[in-house]
Every structure is written in C-alpha cells, then in structure tokens.
A protein has these predicted regions:
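Short, structured protein-protein interaction patches enriched in aromatics and acidic/basic residues
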Residues: 1-24, 32-34
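Short, surface-exposed secondary-structure edge patches
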Residues: 24-25, 119
Length: 174
C-alpha cells in the first residue's frame, strides 16, 4: 500500500491509504511510499506534515508555504479605526435584504451580483472585509475568496451584532 497525498486548488490537503497507482510522483522512505498526482506535486513543494494531538485524538497538520494566508478576524474596534483613518478597504454585508433592513453599517455594500463582480475584478491583495449578523456566513464567503487566491481577507468578528453592542448602540440588535 501507499499513502496518497492530494492537495486541491484551494490548498485543502488529504491523506489516504491505498494500493499504489501508476503516474504522478512517488517518494519512498524506508517502508513508507508517498504518492502524489502531478497537480498535488506542484503544490507540495516545501510542505511540512506533522502529527498533532487534539481532544479527538491524533491527526495530521499541514504547513504549506504556497497556501494563501488564512482569513483574518478583524475586531469591530479595528474596523472602526480603519474606517476613521480612511484606510482603503472594501466592506461587504453578506446578509440578505431582510436583515439589512433591520440593522446595517452605512459603509458596507450589500453582497449582490454587482458586489460579486466588483470583488472578482479587485487585485488579489485588496483589503476586503466581510460581515454578517455574527460572523459565520461572512467567514464562509471570505473562505470562498481565499480559495480563489485572495490574500488580504478579513471577517468581522462578531458581525453587526458586535458592532451594535460595542461601537454604535443606536444600531438595533436582533
């Protein structure tokens, strides 16, 4: 058997044990054989694989120098300071019209077809901040753009709920 390493275009890594396959790249060290397809091999240069312990047991962690940086969490205080300074950033509200009608940040653009086209045309290193109610949906949108190669992505930690509680108490919470 061989260990098959796959690294997809989003730099998600997977390991599987199975029979050796023809083609691709093969690396052996003693009794262990690692196989990669040609696309994974191109993404694996410099890859470090480590065994880690967690509450769920042992697993693997991957440190890939070619992977785009993770989505950064931006606090509401950091966003306010950036807006006050006039920093060049793009702020998008990924919630639907119904939620934006309840509470909104004036500086945020709604996440619609026009916003998607705008972001798709921005440089990969543009500062882009996504927000939603509490941060879950905006994190998912940011991760989508991370997989597309964008490198300066931020999720507003706590979303508009945190903004309303910590920055502007006149914005309603829901």
């Amino acid at each position: 058997d061989a260990i098959h390493l796959k690294i997809n275009a989003g730099f998600e890594h997977s390991l599987a044990l199975g029979p050796p396959r023809a083609g691709g790249l093969e690396v052996s060290s003693g009794p262990v054989t690692l196989q990669l397809d040609r696309w994974s091999a191109a993404r694996a240069d410099g890859l470090k694989i480590r065994v880690r312990e967690s509450l769920q047991g042992q697993g693997f962690s991957f440190d890939n120098p070619h992977a785009p940086p993770p989505v950064k969490q931006m606090s509401v205080q950091e966003l306010r300071a950036a807006l006050d300074r006039g920093d060049k950033l793009w702020l998008f509200d990924v919630r639907g019209d119904d939620e934006r009608a309840l509470a909104s940040l004036p500086a945020a653009k709604p996440w619609d077809e026009d916003a998607i086209k705008l972001v798709d045309g921005l440089p990969a290193d543009a500062t882009i901040v996504f927000h939603c109610h509490r941060g879950g949906r905006s994190q998912a949108v940011a991760e989508r753009y991370r997989r597309k190669g964008y490198t300066n992505l931020h999720n507003l930690a706590g979303g508009i709920d945190a903004w309303a509680r910590e920055i502007d108490r006149e914005i309603p919470t829901y």
